[in-house]
């Protein structure tokens, strides 16, 4: 039986500052590093073998995976002290466009809470110059179907 393991990146500096992050490279906080270690502890505790790792190209996601895999002691995924991981921008999180870098509370005060809620939670209404959730699905799904789904169907365990 194969497993698909989904791990969200640990807290980033902009998560802490309540800012829209999108595709901006923002480092993990100390709390984010601890969260990544806890993910690794859970993988180890449940004896989950991982065959493949896929990630966005964003450093916070890559660092989370690296910390978790080291903590889980999955040496099969490390070569020459580097994590064996496929990085692809099709797996990046949502692009918030013109909202990137803005404080969420200040943005709600400027544009109205309802409008910001629509931009964040509506399926097909993107923020200005950003992606809707529909756009994200359109970007991620073909990559997932082509590169990840076949591995799962072959019985491999994949961490994203």
Feature names for model-found ranges:
Residues 10, 55-58, 90, 121, ...:
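Short, well-ordered beta-to-alpha junction loops that form the rim of enzyme active sites
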Residues 135-160:
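GST-like fold's C-terminal all-alpha helical module
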Residues 18, 76-77, 150:
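Short secondary-structure boundary/capping segments
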Residues 11-67, 71, 108, 126-142:
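Loop-to-helix element that buttresses phosphate recognition and phosphoryl-transfer chemistry
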Residues 39-117, 145-146:
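Phosphate-coordination/substrate-recognition cap region in phosphate-metabolizing enzymes
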Residues 1-5:
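Extreme N-terminal starter segment of soluble prokaryotic enzymes
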Residues 114-128:
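Extended, charge-rich low-complexity interaction segments
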């Amino acid at each position: 039986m194969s497993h698909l393991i989904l791990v969200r990146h640990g807290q980033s500096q902009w998560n802490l500052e309540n800012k829209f992050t999108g595709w901006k490279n923002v480092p993990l906080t100390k709390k984010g590093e601890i969260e990544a270690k806890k993910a690794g502890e859970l993988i180890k505790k449940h004896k989950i073998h991982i065959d493949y790792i896929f990630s966005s190209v964003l450093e916070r996601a890559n660092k989370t995976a690296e910390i978790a895999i080291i903590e889980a002691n999955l040496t099969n995924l490390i070569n020459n002290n580097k994590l064996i991981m496929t990085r692809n921008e099709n797996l990046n999180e949502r692009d918030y466009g013109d909202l990137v870098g803005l404080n969420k509370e200040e943005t709600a005060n400027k544009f109205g809470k309802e409008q910001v809620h629509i931009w964040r939670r509506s399926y097909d209404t993107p923020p200005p110059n950003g992606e809707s959730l529909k756009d994200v699905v359109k970007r991620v799904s073909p990559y997932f179907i082509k590169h990840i789904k076949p591995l799962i169907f072959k019985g491999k365990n994949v961490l994203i």
